[in-house]
Amino acid sequence: MLLLAGLLRRARPPRRPSVRRLSGLLDRYGFVPPASLTPHSASDDGGAKKRRPKKPPYRPPSSLDRGGRPAARSDLPFDFRFSYTESSPGDKPIGLREPKYSPFGPGRLDRPWTGLCAPAVDTTLRDAHADDPAPAAERELEEARRRERERVLGEPLTPAERAFLVSKCQKSRTKKQINLGRDGLTHNMLNDIHNHWKNDEAVRVKCLGVPTVDMQNVCHQLEDKTGGLIIHRHGGQLILYRGRHYNPKKRPVIPLMLWKPAEPVYPRLIKTTIEGLTVEETKEMRKKGLYVPVLTKLAKNGYYASLVPMVRDAFLTDELVRIDSKGLPKSDYRKIGVKLRDLVPCIIVSFDKEQIIVWRGKDYNGTIQDNTQKTSVSVLEEESAGAESENGDQEQASSDWASDECSQLSSSDEMPDDKSAISEADSD
Protein backbone atom coordinates (compact mmCIF):
# COMPACT_ATOMS: atom_id res chain seq x y z
CA MET A 1 0.00 0.00 0.00
CA LEU A 2 2.76 2.36 0.86
CA LEU A 3 4.41 1.66 -2.49
CA LEU A 4 1.20 2.36 -4.36
CA ALA A 5 0.66 5.63 -2.53
CA GLY A 6 4.20 6.78 -3.37
CA LEU A 7 3.67 6.07 -7.01
CA LEU A 8 0.43 8.05 -7.04
CA ARG A 9 2.12 11.03 -5.43
CA ARG A 10 4.88 10.99 -7.99
CA ALA A 11 2.47 10.91 -10.93
CA ARG A 12 2.18 14.30 -12.54
CA PRO A 13 -0.98 15.72 -14.08
CA PRO A 14 -1.08 15.70 -17.93
CA ARG A 15 0.21 18.78 -19.66
CA ARG A 16 -2.27 21.10 -21.27
CA PRO A 17 -1.58 22.34 -24.75
CA SER A 18 0.19 25.67 -24.58
CA VAL A 19 -1.76 28.62 -25.85
CA ARG A 20 0.23 30.77 -28.21
CA ARG A 21 0.15 34.37 -27.12
CA LEU A 22 0.14 36.92 -29.86
CA SER A 23 2.10 40.10 -29.46
CA GLY A 24 0.23 43.34 -28.79
CA LEU A 25 2.35 45.08 -31.39
CA LEU A 26 0.20 43.55 -34.12
CA ASP A 27 -2.79 45.65 -33.04
CA ARG A 28 -0.70 48.77 -32.63
CA TYR A 29 1.16 48.77 -35.97
CA GLY A 30 -1.21 46.72 -38.14
CA PHE A 31 1.61 44.48 -39.37
CA VAL A 32 0.52 41.63 -41.65
CA PRO A 33 3.12 38.86 -41.94
CA PRO A 34 3.97 37.74 -45.48
CA ALA A 35 2.79 34.39 -46.72
CA SER A 36 6.27 32.96 -46.53
CA LEU A 37 6.35 33.50 -42.74
CA THR A 38 2.93 32.04 -42.11
CA PRO A 39 3.20 28.48 -40.80
CA HIS A 40 1.48 25.92 -42.99
CA SER A 41 -0.40 23.04 -41.58
CA ALA A 42 -0.54 19.58 -43.07
CA SER A 43 -4.16 20.11 -44.07
CA ASP A 44 -3.29 23.05 -46.33
CA ASP A 45 -0.91 20.94 -48.51
CA GLY A 46 -3.77 19.06 -50.13
CA GLY A 47 -2.31 15.70 -49.14
CA ALA A 48 0.32 15.62 -51.94
CA LYS A 49 3.19 17.76 -53.11
CA LYS A 50 3.10 19.23 -56.60
CA ARG A 51 5.84 17.83 -58.87
CA ARG A 52 7.70 19.92 -61.37
CA PRO A 53 6.82 19.04 -64.95
CA LYS A 54 9.55 17.10 -66.70
CA LYS A 55 11.36 18.66 -69.62
CA PRO A 56 10.67 17.05 -72.99
CA PRO A 57 13.56 14.91 -74.26
CA TYR A 58 16.03 16.61 -76.58
CA ARG A 59 15.16 16.21 -80.24
CA PRO A 60 17.88 17.15 -82.73
CA PRO A 61 16.83 19.24 -85.74
CA SER A 62 15.89 17.18 -88.78
CA SER A 63 14.99 17.97 -92.36
CA LEU A 64 12.16 15.44 -92.10
CA ASP A 65 10.37 17.55 -89.49
CA ARG A 66 7.97 19.74 -91.43
CA GLY A 67 6.80 21.67 -88.37
CA GLY A 68 3.19 21.59 -89.48
CA ARG A 69 3.94 22.96 -92.95
CA PRO A 70 1.91 21.55 -95.86
CA ALA A 71 3.43 19.25 -98.45
CA ALA A 72 5.22 20.85 -101.40
CA ARG A 73 3.36 21.03 -104.70
CA SER A 74 5.12 21.12 -108.05
CA ASP A 75 3.54 22.10 -111.37
CA LEU A 76 6.08 20.16 -113.45
CA PRO A 77 3.99 17.97 -115.79
CA PHE A 78 6.22 14.87 -115.84
CA ASP A 79 6.75 11.95 -113.48
CA PHE A 80 9.55 12.42 -110.93
CA ARG A 81 12.23 9.73 -111.24
CA PHE A 82 15.68 9.36 -109.74
CA SER A 83 17.28 9.22 -113.21
CA TYR A 84 15.58 10.33 -116.40
CA THR A 85 18.19 8.93 -118.81
CA GLU A 86 18.94 5.57 -117.16
CA SER A 87 15.32 4.56 -116.53
CA SER A 88 12.43 4.25 -118.94
CA PRO A 89 8.69 4.03 -118.30
CA GLY A 90 8.59 1.10 -120.73
CA ASP A 91 10.83 -1.08 -118.52
CA LYS A 92 8.55 -3.14 -116.30
CA PRO A 93 10.18 -4.53 -113.13
CA ILE A 94 9.10 -7.80 -111.55
CA GLY A 95 9.39 -6.61 -107.96
CA LEU A 96 10.66 -4.03 -105.47
CA ARG A 97 13.61 -4.35 -103.10
CA GLU A 98 12.07 -2.29 -100.31
CA PRO A 99 8.68 -0.88 -99.28
CA LYS A 100 7.42 2.17 -101.11
CA TYR A 101 9.27 4.80 -99.07
CA SER A 102 9.21 8.15 -100.83
CA PRO A 103 12.78 9.48 -101.34
CA PHE A 104 11.39 13.00 -100.94
CA GLY A 105 10.69 12.31 -97.26
CA PRO A 106 7.42 11.65 -95.43
CA GLY A 107 4.84 14.36 -96.00
CA ARG A 108 7.13 16.56 -98.12
CA LEU A 109 5.50 16.01 -101.54
CA ASP A 110 1.86 15.77 -102.54
CA ARG A 111 2.61 13.04 -105.10
CA PRO A 112 2.54 9.37 -104.03
CA TRP A 113 5.63 7.23 -104.60
CA THR A 114 4.97 4.04 -106.57
CA GLY A 115 8.40 2.49 -106.00
CA LEU A 116 9.59 3.67 -109.44
CA CYS A 117 8.41 7.27 -109.77
CA ALA A 118 6.12 9.96 -108.40
CA PRO A 119 3.51 10.35 -111.19
CA ALA A 120 2.15 13.76 -112.07
CA VAL A 121 -1.29 12.27 -112.80
CA ASP A 122 -3.03 9.55 -110.83
CA THR A 123 -2.11 6.22 -112.42
CA THR A 124 -5.57 4.79 -111.73
CA LEU A 125 -6.96 7.07 -114.46
CA ARG A 126 -5.00 5.23 -117.16
CA ASP A 127 -6.79 2.77 -119.42
CA ALA A 128 -4.40 -0.02 -120.39
CA HIS A 129 -6.71 -1.29 -123.17
CA ALA A 130 -7.12 2.10 -124.87
CA ASP A 131 -5.15 3.16 -127.94
CA ASP A 132 -3.66 6.04 -125.94
CA PRO A 133 -3.38 4.96 -122.27
CA ALA A 134 -2.45 8.49 -121.15
CA PRO A 135 -5.45 10.27 -119.62
CA ALA A 136 -6.74 13.57 -120.96
CA ALA A 137 -5.27 15.44 -117.97
CA GLU A 138 -1.78 14.20 -118.84
CA ARG A 139 -2.13 15.22 -122.48
CA GLU A 140 -3.23 18.68 -121.40
CA LEU A 141 -0.15 18.99 -119.18
CA GLU A 142 2.12 18.05 -122.09
CA GLU A 143 0.49 20.62 -124.34
CA ALA A 144 0.77 23.33 -121.67
CA ARG A 145 4.44 22.50 -121.15
CA ARG A 146 5.13 22.76 -124.90
CA ARG A 147 3.52 26.20 -125.11
CA GLU A 148 5.35 27.43 -122.01
CA ARG A 149 8.69 26.24 -123.38
CA GLU A 150 8.14 28.08 -126.66
CA ARG A 151 7.24 31.24 -124.77
CA VAL A 152 10.34 31.11 -122.55
CA LEU A 153 12.75 30.38 -125.41
CA GLY A 154 11.45 33.31 -127.43
CA GLU A 155 13.01 34.26 -130.75
CA PRO A 156 15.87 32.13 -132.12
CA LEU A 157 19.40 33.22 -131.31
CA THR A 158 21.41 34.93 -134.00
CA PRO A 159 24.80 33.40 -134.93
CA ALA A 160 26.61 36.21 -133.11
CA GLU A 161 24.57 35.71 -129.92
CA ARG A 162 25.10 31.97 -130.02
CA ALA A 163 28.84 32.38 -130.58
CA PHE A 164 29.07 34.80 -127.65
CA LEU A 165 27.28 32.40 -125.27
CA VAL A 166 29.39 29.44 -126.38
CA SER A 167 32.66 31.32 -125.95
CA LYS A 168 31.51 32.53 -122.54
CA CYS A 169 30.98 28.93 -121.34
CA GLN A 170 34.36 27.57 -122.45
CA LYS A 171 36.83 26.17 -119.91
CA SER A 172 39.18 29.09 -120.43
CA ARG A 173 36.46 31.55 -119.42
CA THR A 174 34.66 29.82 -116.53
CA LYS A 175 35.01 26.80 -114.27
CA LYS A 176 31.28 26.42 -113.69
CA GLN A 177 29.91 23.19 -115.08
CA ILE A 178 27.56 20.33 -114.22
CA ASN A 179 29.00 16.81 -114.31
CA LEU A 180 26.69 14.11 -115.66
CA GLY A 181 28.06 10.70 -114.65
CA ARG A 182 26.97 7.06 -114.47
CA ASP A 183 23.60 7.90 -112.90
CA GLY A 184 22.70 10.10 -115.87
CA LEU A 185 20.40 13.08 -115.55
CA THR A 186 19.15 12.78 -111.97
CA HIS A 187 16.20 14.62 -110.47
CA ASN A 188 18.31 16.84 -108.20
CA MET A 189 20.38 17.92 -111.23
CA LEU A 190 17.36 19.87 -112.48
CA ASN A 191 17.61 22.08 -109.41
CA ASP A 192 21.35 22.57 -110.00
CA ILE A 193 20.73 23.66 -113.59
CA HIS A 194 18.17 26.25 -112.53
CA ASN A 195 20.60 27.50 -109.86
CA HIS A 196 23.20 28.10 -112.59
CA TRP A 197 20.61 29.82 -114.76
CA LYS A 198 19.94 32.24 -111.93
CA ASN A 199 23.16 34.11 -112.74
CA ASP A 200 24.14 32.91 -116.23
CA GLU A 201 22.21 32.55 -119.47
CA ALA A 202 23.86 29.24 -120.35
CA VAL A 203 25.52 26.41 -118.44
CA ARG A 204 28.12 23.85 -119.49
CA VAL A 205 27.23 20.17 -118.97
CA LYS A 206 30.00 17.55 -119.05
CA CYS A 207 28.80 14.00 -119.87
CA LEU A 208 30.94 10.94 -119.12
CA GLY A 209 30.36 7.27 -118.44
CA VAL A 210 27.44 4.98 -119.26
CA PRO A 211 24.93 7.67 -120.42
CA THR A 212 27.22 8.71 -123.29
CA VAL A 213 26.37 5.48 -125.15
CA ASP A 214 23.09 7.17 -126.10
CA MET A 215 23.92 10.86 -126.31
CA GLN A 216 20.76 11.59 -128.27
CA ASN A 217 18.68 10.47 -125.29
CA VAL A 218 20.77 12.66 -122.97
CA CYS A 219 20.22 15.73 -125.15
CA HIS A 220 16.51 15.01 -125.48
CA GLN A 221 15.99 14.55 -121.73
CA LEU A 222 17.97 17.69 -120.90
CA GLU A 223 15.83 19.84 -123.19
CA ASP A 224 12.60 18.12 -122.19
CA LYS A 225 12.99 18.22 -118.41
CA THR A 226 14.65 21.63 -118.03
CA GLY A 227 12.85 23.49 -120.81
CA GLY A 228 16.17 24.82 -122.14
CA LEU A 229 17.86 24.49 -125.52
CA ILE A 230 21.21 22.91 -126.42
CA ILE A 231 23.01 25.47 -128.58
CA HIS A 232 26.39 23.72 -128.84
CA ARG A 233 27.76 20.21 -128.58
CA HIS A 234 31.31 18.95 -128.83
CA GLY A 235 31.78 15.33 -127.77
CA GLY A 236 30.39 15.00 -124.27
CA GLN A 237 30.35 18.75 -123.63
CA LEU A 238 26.98 20.49 -124.00
CA ILE A 239 25.96 24.13 -123.68
CA LEU A 240 22.40 24.45 -122.36
CA TYR A 241 20.67 27.80 -122.95
CA ARG A 242 17.83 28.95 -120.65
CA GLY A 243 15.84 31.14 -123.11
CA ARG A 244 15.24 34.83 -123.73
CA HIS A 245 12.26 35.24 -121.40
CA TYR A 246 13.49 33.07 -118.52
CA ASN A 247 12.66 34.59 -115.13
CA PRO A 248 14.58 33.11 -112.15
CA LYS A 249 11.90 34.32 -109.74
CA LYS A 250 9.29 32.22 -111.55
CA ARG A 251 11.36 29.05 -111.78
CA PRO A 252 9.42 25.80 -111.21
CA VAL A 253 9.23 24.20 -107.79
CA ILE A 254 11.60 21.20 -107.75
CA PRO A 255 11.45 19.22 -104.47
CA LEU A 256 14.75 17.53 -103.72
CA MET A 257 15.26 13.81 -103.17
CA LEU A 258 16.81 13.15 -99.77
CA TRP A 259 18.26 9.75 -100.69
CA LYS A 260 18.66 7.43 -103.65
CA PRO A 261 15.80 4.95 -103.90
CA ALA A 262 16.61 1.28 -104.25
CA GLU A 263 16.65 -0.15 -107.76
CA PRO A 264 13.68 -2.41 -108.54
CA VAL A 265 14.11 -6.04 -109.54
CA TYR A 266 14.19 -6.59 -113.31
CA PRO A 267 14.16 -9.87 -115.27
CA ARG A 268 17.49 -11.61 -115.76
CA LEU A 269 19.63 -10.35 -118.62
CA ILE A 270 21.42 -13.64 -119.24
CA LYS A 271 19.05 -16.54 -119.77
CA THR A 272 20.00 -20.21 -119.57
CA THR A 273 19.55 -20.56 -123.31
CA ILE A 274 19.59 -17.94 -126.02
CA GLU A 275 16.35 -17.62 -127.94
CA GLY A 276 16.51 -19.79 -131.05
CA LEU A 277 19.44 -21.92 -129.85
CA THR A 278 19.73 -25.14 -127.90
CA VAL A 279 21.57 -25.54 -124.61
CA GLU A 280 24.64 -27.03 -126.30
CA GLU A 281 24.74 -24.30 -128.94
CA THR A 282 24.46 -21.64 -126.24
CA LYS A 283 27.37 -23.11 -124.27
CA GLU A 284 29.48 -23.38 -127.41
CA MET A 285 28.75 -19.77 -128.38
CA ARG A 286 29.71 -18.47 -124.92
CA LYS A 287 33.01 -20.33 -125.06
CA LYS A 288 33.66 -19.13 -128.59
CA GLY A 289 32.88 -15.52 -127.66
CA LEU A 290 35.76 -15.38 -125.16
CA TYR A 291 38.29 -16.07 -127.97
CA VAL A 292 36.89 -13.58 -130.48
CA PRO A 293 39.27 -10.64 -131.15
CA VAL A 294 38.51 -7.63 -129.00
CA LEU A 295 36.67 -4.86 -130.82
CA THR A 296 37.65 -2.12 -128.35
CA LYS A 297 38.58 -1.60 -124.71
CA LEU A 298 36.41 0.66 -122.60
CA ALA A 299 38.04 3.14 -120.24
CA LYS A 300 36.52 3.91 -116.88
CA ASN A 301 34.29 7.00 -116.99
CA GLY A 302 35.05 7.41 -120.67
CA TYR A 303 33.13 8.70 -123.65
CA TYR A 304 31.31 5.84 -125.40
CA ALA A 305 29.29 7.62 -128.10
CA SER A 306 31.13 5.77 -130.91
CA LEU A 307 30.44 2.32 -129.45
CA VAL A 308 27.10 1.66 -131.19
CA PRO A 309 28.38 2.50 -134.73
CA MET A 310 31.46 0.34 -134.11
CA VAL A 311 29.34 -2.68 -133.13
CA ARG A 312 27.07 -2.20 -136.16
CA ASP A 313 30.07 -2.08 -138.51
CA ALA A 314 31.58 -5.17 -136.86
CA PHE A 315 28.36 -7.13 -137.39
CA LEU A 316 28.77 -6.69 -141.16
CA THR A 317 31.61 -9.24 -141.09
CA ASP A 318 31.40 -11.08 -137.74
CA GLU A 319 28.47 -12.62 -135.93
CA LEU A 320 30.05 -12.29 -132.46
CA VAL A 321 31.56 -9.12 -130.98
CA ARG A 322 33.61 -8.92 -127.79
CA ILE A 323 34.19 -5.67 -125.89
CA ASP A 324 36.81 -5.57 -123.15
CA SER A 325 35.45 -3.82 -120.04
CA LYS A 326 38.08 -4.72 -117.46
CA GLY A 327 38.31 -2.17 -114.67
CA LEU A 328 34.71 -0.99 -115.02
CA PRO A 329 32.21 -1.59 -112.21
CA LYS A 330 29.92 -4.54 -112.81
CA SER A 331 26.83 -2.38 -112.92
CA ASP A 332 28.42 -0.14 -115.58
CA TYR A 333 29.22 -2.76 -118.21
CA ARG A 334 25.90 -4.50 -117.62
CA LYS A 335 24.10 -1.20 -118.33
CA ILE A 336 26.23 -0.75 -121.45
CA GLY A 337 25.18 -4.22 -122.60
CA VAL A 338 21.50 -3.33 -122.15
CA LYS A 339 21.94 -0.13 -124.19
CA LEU A 340 23.68 -2.06 -126.98
CA ARG A 341 20.85 -4.60 -126.99
CA ASP A 342 18.29 -1.84 -127.55
CA LEU A 343 20.25 0.47 -129.87
CA VAL A 344 22.17 -1.84 -132.23
CA PRO A 345 20.01 -4.13 -131.82
CA CYS A 346 21.68 -7.38 -130.76
CA ILE A 347 21.48 -10.29 -128.32
CA ILE A 348 23.55 -10.36 -125.12
CA VAL A 349 25.50 -13.63 -124.86
CA SER A 350 27.62 -13.27 -121.73
CA PHE A 351 29.35 -10.94 -119.26
CA ASP A 352 31.96 -13.49 -118.15
CA LYS A 353 35.46 -12.31 -117.23
CA GLU A 354 34.40 -8.65 -117.55
CA GLN A 355 33.78 -9.07 -121.28
CA ILE A 356 30.66 -7.87 -123.11
CA ILE A 357 29.85 -10.52 -125.72
CA VAL A 358 26.95 -9.80 -128.08
CA TRP A 359 25.51 -11.78 -130.99
CA ARG A 360 23.87 -10.29 -134.06
CA GLY A 361 21.21 -13.03 -134.29
CA LYS A 362 20.15 -15.55 -136.91
CA ASP A 363 17.99 -13.23 -139.01
CA TYR A 364 20.61 -10.51 -139.44
CA ASN A 365 20.43 -9.17 -143.01
CA GLY A 366 23.22 -6.59 -142.91
CA THR A 367 21.00 -3.50 -142.76
CA ILE A 368 21.69 -0.99 -140.04
CA GLN A 369 18.63 -0.53 -137.89
CA ASP A 370 18.67 2.70 -135.99
CA ASN A 371 15.97 2.67 -133.34
CA THR A 372 17.04 5.97 -131.91
CA GLN A 373 16.05 8.31 -134.73
CA LYS A 374 13.34 10.74 -133.84
CA THR A 375 10.59 11.73 -136.24
CA SER A 376 10.22 15.19 -134.81
CA VAL A 377 12.56 17.96 -135.90
CA SER A 378 14.43 19.61 -133.06
CA VAL A 379 13.88 23.22 -132.24
CA LEU A 380 17.51 23.90 -133.06
CA GLU A 381 17.04 22.74 -136.66
CA GLU A 382 14.02 25.01 -137.07
CA GLU A 383 15.98 27.98 -135.74
CA SER A 384 18.91 27.34 -138.05
CA ALA A 385 16.59 26.88 -141.02
CA GLY A 386 14.99 30.24 -140.26
CA ALA A 387 18.36 31.92 -139.97
CA GLU A 388 19.42 30.39 -143.29
CA SER A 389 16.39 31.75 -145.11
CA GLU A 390 16.86 35.20 -143.62
CA ASN A 391 20.57 35.52 -144.29
CA GLY A 392 20.55 33.72 -147.65
CA ASP A 393 24.09 32.51 -147.11
CA GLN A 394 24.21 28.81 -147.95
CA GLU A 395 27.89 28.36 -147.14
CA GLN A 396 27.42 29.92 -143.73
CA ALA A 397 24.50 27.62 -142.96
CA SER A 398 26.34 24.49 -144.09
CA SER A 399 29.35 25.31 -141.93
CA ASP A 400 27.16 25.80 -138.87
CA TRP A 401 26.00 22.20 -139.04
CA ALA A 402 28.61 19.68 -137.94
CA SER A 403 28.12 16.12 -136.89
CA ASP A 404 29.99 14.66 -133.97
CA GLU A 405 33.06 12.88 -135.32
CA CYS A 406 33.15 10.55 -132.35
CA SER A 407 29.57 9.34 -132.70
CA GLN A 408 27.00 8.80 -135.42
CA LEU A 409 24.37 7.87 -132.87
CA SER A 410 23.45 11.48 -132.29
CA SER A 411 23.65 12.51 -135.95
CA SER A 412 19.85 12.77 -136.15
CA ASP A 413 19.95 15.68 -133.74
CA GLU A 414 22.46 17.58 -135.92
CA MET A 415 23.80 19.72 -133.11
CA PRO A 416 25.53 22.80 -134.56
CA ASP A 417 29.23 23.38 -134.27
CA ASP A 418 29.89 27.04 -133.59
CA LYS A 419 33.60 27.10 -134.37
CA SER A 420 32.99 28.98 -137.62
CA ALA A 421 30.68 31.46 -135.93
CA ILE A 422 33.19 32.00 -133.14
CA SER A 423 36.03 32.62 -135.59
CA GLU A 424 33.91 35.16 -137.51
CA ALA A 425 33.01 36.96 -134.29
CA ASP A 426 36.68 37.09 -133.29
CA SER A 427 37.73 38.39 -136.70
CA ASP A 428 35.12 41.16 -136.50
From Swiss-Prot:
Disordered: annotated span: 33-100, 129-152, 378-428
Places the protein is found: Mitochondrion
GO CC aspect terms: mitochondrion; ribonucleoprotein complex
Organism expressing this protein natively: Oryza sativa subsp. japonica
Pfam family, one: CRS1_YhbY
Transit peptide, residues from-to: 1-21
Composition bias, Polar residues: 394-413
SMART domains: CRS1_YhbY
Name the UniProt record assigns to this protein: CRS2-associated factor 1, mitochondrial
Classification via SUPFAM superfamilies: YhbY-like
